[in-house]
Every structure is written in C-alpha cells, then in structure tokens.
Amino acid sequence: MLSSLEGATLGVWISHGEGKFNLPMEEKNYNIVAKYGYEGYPSNPNGSDYNTAMLCDKTGRHLVTMPHIERSMFQWNWANYPNGRKDEVSPWLEAFVSARKWLEKVK
C-alpha cells in the first residue's frame, strides 16, 4: 500500500494525545513501514518506540497508522506545502489508490 512512497519524506497531520506504539521487542521483530522524522517532540509527538508512525502485518494486508493521512490529501490541507509544487492531490493519495487496486485484484 505504501511501496510507491518508499524513501519519501512527507508532512502529515497528527492529532492524537493518547496513541502510542509500545513495542517491547527489538525493532527487527516488527514490520515498521513508516517512521516519524526524528525521535522526540514535535516530530514524534507521542514518543512511539522506534519513531514508529505505521505498522503492517506480515502479509501487508493490515496497516495501523497513527498519522492522519486522510487529512493530508490536498495541498491546502497542509500547514506547509513546498513552493513550486503543482500537485492536484498530495502524495498520500497513493496509499488509498493502492488499497483500491489491491481490493479489485482480490475480489
């Protein structure tokens, strides 16, 4: 679902106070698919272990996400959007497009 965004650094809305990934095992035991930019507030606002923003199960079918990518679809939703970009939608839309394609394939 997120493979087309591999290596990207993207802004995203965070709006939670209670959510936090507590991961007691070593990082290699988890399928962490997205991380906050750096450890600590404000980048990692809830202090999640290993700067974890998103986790996926081993099959790739189940994604758990703390950031609100659904609130970051359009450039006017972003607090800061890079100058000179001409996107109609933000790169986060890729996650939803990929999910739909996967669903259509496994019908």
What are these regions (language model features)?
Residues 1-107:
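Amide-donor transfer/coupling interface in amidating biosynthetic enzymes
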